[in-house]
Amino acid sequence: MSSGWEESEFVFCDLQTAARYIRRDNPQAARAFLEAAYDSFEFLARNPGLGRKRADLGFPDVRVWRIAGFRRYLVFYRELPDRVQIWRVLHGARNLHATLSD
């Protein structure tokens, strides 16, 4: 079991971009999105093997989890020996292969 989680250098920007987009229509939903994202990070730190592996995206060590209440947003993460690394948070409609390869 991992002892916590860490964010990659991409996560802050991913979360802010998504929250700004959501805020245009519903400021309360944007706050709820950020809370749900961080709740997901904590959940994954306690249950790192639950996400689905997505080797089809070219990253065999990356797992994917949907954010509760915002199921179109995906958390991409890696299970490390002592923690979970939250790698990206992206909308599922994006070209995931191209975005993750950048």
Residue positions per predicted region:
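Enriched for short, Lys/Arg-rich terminal
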Residues: 67-102
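Basic, Lys/Arg-enriched alpha-helical interface segments
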Residues: 1-62, 97, 101
